UniProtKB/Swiss-Prot annotation:
Gene3D superfamilies xrefs: 1.10.357.80, 1.20.120.1390, 3.30.230.140, 3.30.70.2480, Viral RNA-directed RNA polymerase, 4-helical domain
GO annotation terms (biological process): DNA-templated transcription; viral genome replication
GO cellular component terms attached to this protein's record: virion component
Pfam (any one): Rotavirus_VP1
RdRp catalytic domain residues: 501-687
SUPFAM superfamilies, sorted: DNA/RNA polymerases (SSF56672)
Protein known as: RNA-directed RNA polymerase
Family: Belongs to the reoviridae RNA-directed RNA polymerase family.
Cofactor needs: Mg(2+)
Length: 1088
């Protein structure tokens, strides 16, 4: 058992360092004799500590426990009231405290003033502009840093330098906090008025960001960047991140390409040793100089100097420093503005009359034609999804807010809730459910707003529309997305691709006679000028489509969709401003509709096509690719002559002028070698990702527990690390200790051990080895996994009461009735469970479940209950396989060039040996014939878990299942009687196993699992024809080989001699694997 338990023990001695503090380790074992010794050891420890005796004697007396059993948790208690943070902080508060410049930011409340100056009274106070929104406190963060510093004060050589750098930065933070005192948080980890009133308003969020930055310092360069950002972000809460990251959009255009990877016909990355020169007009350098000047004006010194130094030779070798600056700039924290300012931002654009109507017309027509193209097949064939659009909408109704709180009655229980799903049920029960009437959003019923905060950009507003809008749009949008899935232009939706494919697409056509145009159109998407042409284009498309069919239900679906667009053309929003709610006419497009992503992509594609058609009047070129990815679009243009500086400048100016004619305030750039968009950037033929995920500040509060947030923290750390921003792992582990500890009483706390937090059970939080997902197969690991499974799902009285009410039952049976043609328990139960799960977003229910979960956990962490579960997990399968493998040393040459320079060494090494993959492995069963058959006749979408259950039933049960979903008997018979059915069994099992093994997450998503180089390290003699068994053996072997290589930087070869007699046993077992949801898997999913 590794590092974690060691650090945990050290951390506890650091935190509770008084005489009265005691640490009692609790052990367990799957061996019953040893287990009874564990229990004995534990009770004697308790006995001794009650009587104030030392535990040392017991440790030697029970050395068998300590050596052979597994640490389960550590019970720690201390009677000290800890103002320990303040005491320890003084030691580090040796510098001059920072003084905020109170005139720096345009908006008064974005200046870091003393809270009582911004909010004179408690009534006016809000923490919404500085709330770290994370379930850990500033005092914990300070403790974690001071623990690290104390632990490393005797480091030597290179490590000593890191210690000194961090110490120096921490003294800035410590001194500043010490001047005002450490703000104490309340039980919900919020900072109230009386704590903050005499302190700078942004103190907490600034300190969290600063701690996150200083604990990510390793080199001298890191130190310089961090120091500058820490000092300046204390005053500049508005524009710092934007200033620092702006130059990147130009820097990518300055690096020559000397060898790169391109996408070939098979959609794989293949190396190309082409050389493309960066052709940069003087105008571009002037713009860059302007950006650097702006940085210096804002007080930055070292960062602009680093960029300036790099500009001397613009080498790709030293480009990672530029990437580092770009990533770091996001870690200054979120910019959180008042809602009023966020909304007015989009209304500030003045209307000008001199716009090019011709261009607007073309733009509208392109939107219209694209909408028609996306939907015409479905409409002409009267697709059942468009016919049953209302049912489809209800089945996927979200449990987000519906914009207003209502009093709802569920049986005898009356509750207040804002949730969409609950409102729908209530409306149905009371005859108020009218999906055929789309409520207006005009001055009579303005739209309530949500918010989206992101570092380095302004706060954006989100519409919280009534659920009728969701139902009206759902089915049509799903059809649009299906079309986008097989259209390369839509980079975000393109079938199972990942970002590496988009990278190869760009570099594919770069050459000395082509240039790439890239534009950030986020300003345009939310501008008022976009509204009319955008909505009208969609409406015109819907009108054309309505004439292609005679089916009344399809026409109704299209009409309701059209009505949502008409209503939104005249939209008003409500914004709380102090105690008043302001109504503002809001003509712009905002997120919040189901169509947001799809429609924006359509519009952005139409926009770049409009611009290209304009400039093609002046230049002769071939458009090699056009892509749209979220708020960005880009195109590669190939000319018939070599590109010159003058050409680049002319095209650039013409493009900008063209956008200006539409009054689009966008950032359009032209380069010959690279692009920079929100999701990724390409420089020198290599791909980079921004490592900008904040760790100690969150965007908003949800209903996740501390455990969930600890898992998200770890997951964010991993993503940042893969992208080139590394935070000290010991610090992350310390945060996990703090966030997963459970308080029993005021002075008693229980800290789970590494085994508890890393075994894949319902409680998993992190991996004991970064990038390696391990599935424990030892007796103790399987034992604890079993124990946790026994208390996995917790009941909630409120949820049970609601789901027993007639309101809920009638709703569920109504859905089932509409969906099913005959009785189908699997589906009915599935719907009921899904609906019940949606109730979790109602706070009282999630709180109730959390309490139950914690009390069960407390019991378990003090003594695991033996639980004979018949459930089989993936661990059991791997445990059966493991003994039949023998390993030997092997050698693989590094044969691929680097193309993702920011990857950690050990991950890079694997890609260079076995290659990378540009596709997501299908892990949801959607490619199986049964899934396609169902979607051909029904709006119901079974999950991979359900397909896995169904496909292993008897043939006649599968037939009944299909027929109940409306599949014609003849089709159901054909399916079961054909070869396809047995192929499906294999295919779904494969998907399910990939899903369980998280093959599309973490760094596994980068590796080519079908690499011939990897295959040749694995030898499995072919015995008997059970493809499923062969598959699991191969996959297990590949993961073993890769995990070994990540850990050791060398390769092994595996030989497997699996007995034929065992195969059929294993095959049977494979149809009973239970999937485990944990904070860890949720965090992975959340990364998506």
């Amino acid at each position: 058992m590794g590092k974690y338990n060691l650090i945990l023990s050290e951390y506890l001695s650091f935190i509770y360092n008084s005489q009265s503090a005691v640490q009692i380790p609790i052990y367990y074992s799957s061996n019953s004799e040893l287990e009874s010794r564990c229990i004995e050891f534990h009770s004697k420890c308790l006995e001794n500590s009650k009587n104030g005796l030392s535990l040392k004697k017991l440790f030697s007396e029970y050395s068998d426990v300590i050596e052979n059993a597994t640490l389960l948790s550590i019970l720690s208690y201390s009677y000290d009231k800890y103002n320990a943070v303040e005491r320890k902080l003084v030691k580090y508060a040796k510098s001059k405290p920072l003084e905020a410049d109170l005139t720096l930011n345009e908006l008064d409340y974005e200046n870091n003033k003393i809270t009582s100056e911004l909010f004179p009274t408690e009534e006016e106070y809000t923490d919404s502009l500085m709330d770290p929104a994370i379930l850990t406190s500033l005092s914990s963060n300070l403790n974690a840093v001071m623990f690290w510093l104390e632990k490393h004060e005797n480091d030597t050589a290179e490590k000593l330098k890191i210690y000194k750098r961090r110490l120096d930065l921490f003294s800035i933070v410590a001194s500043t906090i010490n001047k005002y005192g450490v703000p104490r948080h309340n039980a919900k980890y919020r900072y109230e008025y009386d704590v903050m009133k005499d302190k700078p308003y942004y103190l907490v969020t600034w300190a969290n960001s600063s701690i996150e930055m200083l604990m990510s310092v390793f080199s001298h360069e890191d130190y310089l960047i961090a120091k500058e950002l820490i000092v300046l972000s204390y005053s500049n809460r508005s524009t710092l991140a934007k200033l620092v990251s702006s130059p990147m959009s130009i820097l990518v255009a300055l690096v020559d390409i000397n060898g790169t990877f391109i996408t070939n016909e098979e959609l794989e990355l293949e190396f190309s040793n082409k050389y493309v020169r960066a052709i940069v007009p003087d105008q571009t350098f002037d713009e860059l100089k302007q950006m650097l000047d702006n940085m210096r004006k804002a007080g930055l010194v070292d960062i602009p100097k680093m960029i300036q130094d790099w500009l001397v030779d613009c080498s790709i070798e030293r480009f990672p420093l530029m990437a580092k600056i770009y990533s770091w700039s996001f870690h200054v924290g979120f910019r959180k503005q008042k809602m009023l300012d966020a909304a007015l931002d989009q209304l500030k654009t003045e209307y000008t009359e001199n716009v090019d109507d011709e261009m607007y017309r073309e733009y509208t027509m392109l939107i219209r034609d694209e909408v028609v193209k996306m939907l015409e097949e479905s409409v002409k064939h009267d697709d059942h999804l468009l016919q049953d659009s209302e049912l489809a909408g209800l089945l996927s109704m979200s449990s987000a807010s519906n914009g207003e709180s209502r009093q709802l009655k569920f049986g005898r229980k009356t509750i207040f809730s804002t949730k969409k799903n609950m409102h729908v049920m209530d409306d149905m029960a009371n005859g108020r459910y009218t999906p055929g009437i789309i409520p207006p959003v005009n001055a009579d019923k303005p739209i309530p707003l949500g918010r989206r905060d992101v570092p380095g950009r302004r706060t954006r507003i989100i519409f919280i529309l009534p659920y009728e809008y969701f139902i009206a749009q759902h089915a049509v949008v799903e059809k649009m997305l299906i079309y986008a899935k097989h259209t390369r232009e839509y980079a975000e939706f393109y079938s199972q691709s990942n970002q590496l494919l988009s990278y190869g697409d760009v570099t594919r056509f770069l050459s000395n006679n082509s240039m790439v145009l890239y534009t950030d159109v986020s300003q345009w998407d939310s501008s008022q000028h976009n509204t009319q042409p955008f909505r009208k284009g969609i409406i015109m498309g819907l009108d054309i489509l309505a004439n292609m069919t005679n089916d009344a239900r399809v026409i109704q679906t299209l009409n309701l969709y059209k009505q949502t667009q008409i209503n939104l053309m005249d939209s008003y929003v409500q914004i709380p401003d102090g105690n008043v709610i302001k109504k503002i006419q809001y003509g712009a497009v905002a997120s919040g509709e189901k169509q947001t992503k799809a429609a924006n992509s359509i519009a952005n594609l139409a926009l770049i096509k409009t611009v290209l058609s304009r400039i093609s009047n002046k230049y002769s070129f071939i458009t090699k690719i056009i892509r749209v990815d979220g708020d960005d679009n880009y195109a590669v243009l190939q000319f018939n002559t070599e590109v010159t500086k003058q050409m680049v400048q002319d095209v650039s100016n013409d493009v900008r002028e063209t956008y200006a004619r539409m009054n689009a305030k966008v950032k359009a750039l032209v380069s010959t070698v690279g692009i920079e968009i929100a999701k990724r950037y390409i420089a020198g033929g290599k791909i980079f990702f921004r490592a900008g995920i904040n760790l100690l500040n969150n965007e908003k509060r949800g209903q996740s527990t501390q455990w969930d947030q600890a898992a998200v923290l770890y997951s964010n750390y991993i993503v940042n690390r893969l992208r080139g921003f590394e935070t000290d792992r010991e610090f992350i582990l310390t945060k996990i200790m703090q966030m997963t500890s459970v308080a029993i009483t005021g002075s008693l706390r229980l800290f789970p051990s590494e085994r508890v937090l890393t075994t894949n059970s319902t409680f998993k939080v992190f991996d004991s080895e970064d990038f390696i997902i391990e599935y424990g197969t030892t007796d103790d690991e399987v034992y604890i996994q079993r124990a946790f499974m026994s208390l996995s799902s917790q009941k909630s009285g409120i949820a049970d009461e609601i789901s027993a009410s007639s309101t809920f039952k009638n709703y569920v049976s109504k859905l089932s009735e509409q969906l099913l043609f005959s009785k189908n328990n699997i589906v009915s139960r599935g719907i009921a469970l899904t609906e019940k799960a949606k109730l979790n977003s109602y706070a009282p229910i999630s709180l109730e479940k959390r309490r139950a979960q914690i009390s069960a956990l407390l019991t378990m962490l003090q003594k695991p209950v033996t639980f004979k579960s018949s459930k089989i997990t993936i661990n059991d399968i791997l445990k059966d396989i493991k003994p039949f493998f023998t390993l030997s040393e092997a050698h693989l040459p590094m044969q691929y060039q680097k193309f993702m320079p920011n990857l950690p060494e050990n991950v890079q090494y694997i890609i260079q040996c076995i290659g990378s993959r540009t596709y997501q492995i299908e892990d949801d069963g959607s490619k199986s014939a049964i899934s396609r058959l169902i979607s051909k006749y029904s709006v119901y979408k079974p999950s991979i878990e359900e397909l896995y259950k169904v496909i292993s039933l008897h043939e006649n049960e599968i037939q009944l299942y299909l027929i109940s979903l409306g599949i014609p008997k003849i089709d159901a018979d054909t399916y079961v009687g054909s070869k396809i059915y047995s192929q499906d069994k294999y295919r779904i099992l494969e998907s399910y196993v990939y899903n369980l093994l998280s093959i599309n997450y973490g760094c596994y998503q980068l590796f080519d699992f079908n690499s011939p180089d990897l295959e040749k390290l694995i030898r499995i003699p072919f015995k008997g024809k059970i493809p499923a068994v062969t598959f699991i053996l191969h996959l297990y072997a590949k993961l073993e080989v890769i995990n070994y290589a990540i850990k050791n930087g060398s390769w092994i070869s595996l030989f497997c001699n699996y007995p034929k007699s065992e195969m059929i046993k294993l095959w049977k077992k494979m149809w009973n694997i239970t999937s485990l949801r944990s904070p860890y898997t949720n965090a992975n999913f959340f990364q998506d």
